[in-house]
Amino acid sequence: MEENQTNRQFIRLLEKHAVTESLFELVFERPEGWDFEPGQFARLGVEIPGEAEPQFRAYSIASSPSENDLRFLVKVITGGLVSPKLAALEPGQGVVLEGRAEGNLLPARIPGGSTMWYFATGAGLAPFLSIMKHNAETKCEEREEILVVGARTVKEVEGLVELARRHSPTCRVFGAATREEHELQGRLPLLLETGRLEEHAGRKISKEDSRVMLCGNPECIKAVRAHFKARGIVSPRFGAPGQLLVESLW
């Protein structure tokens, strides 16, 4: 790793795996002493022709703090500046890692309850991979963990579900497809509104017994958050306790 006075480090790609046609799992070397908490994100930058400075984007960390590498999920955005270049990297090539880990998508912020629900779309699965793997390693989470992933096609759903189960064999995982026939079909907000999701999982989501974390497509996450707000499940704010944490990304 190379470091300079601007607190930027060059990190090399070690592995690349295709999760779906447009979602890639990238594994980079981890700088010594670069610490993070499960649920946080890092800023990755790539060189852009004609630009004096690298272009940076925030990506949630998918590895657990105990691992010696940094793992990310990158969804390729058509016309995007950064994601296509990240997805095109090959082992040995690298990116710029800027600063320290950041973010407040931390389970400890919403204590209590008996069930922890994770809702993710696409690359929004990344922070939950980190959290679930850390929990499996440390046995620090006593609440039941349920992960719900949403994607367009059955193939995409299967890729996300397989990745999640590989990181946490004990977590209950459910996948929902929006554009193809599936045992759980429809957008996450609709599946919540109709009660189909809770019926399928065999669990009710309540303010008293449940804690909820959301990460993924901003439009979907906004709708899911509004649904939970109507049920009294809200984020902690100004010292008031809450049951919900949210992070939107593409």
Task: For each feature predicted by the language model, list its residue ranges.
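FNR/FR-type flavoprotein reductase catalytic core
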Residues: 4-5, 81-231, 239-242, 246-250
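Ferredoxin-reductase
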Residues: 2-91
